[in-house]
């Protein structure tokens, strides 16, 4: 089953994306480079728990 996750900006701006991932095939924490509109550049987004 796909679980909802939150991708939080590593720049410390507080910006985040929400997405889903299959925990069976990807058991580790997701890290991906995406655009942060607050910082106006690409930064690393890290997976956190969606409350």
Swiss-Prot record:
SUPFAM superfamilies: Zn-binding ribosomal proteins. Residues 1-21 are annotated as: Disordered. The keyword Nucleus does not apply. GO terms for molecular function: structural constituent of ribosome. GO terms for biological process: translation. PROSITE patterns: RIBOSOMAL_L33. This is Large ribosomal subunit protein bL33.
């Amino acid at each position: 089953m796909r679980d909802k996750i939150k991708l939080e900006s590593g720049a410390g701006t507080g910006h985040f994306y929400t997405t889903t991932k299959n925990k069976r095939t990807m058991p580790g924490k997701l890290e991906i480079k995406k655009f942060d509109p607050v910082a106006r550049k690409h930064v690393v987004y890290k997976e956190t728990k969606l409350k």
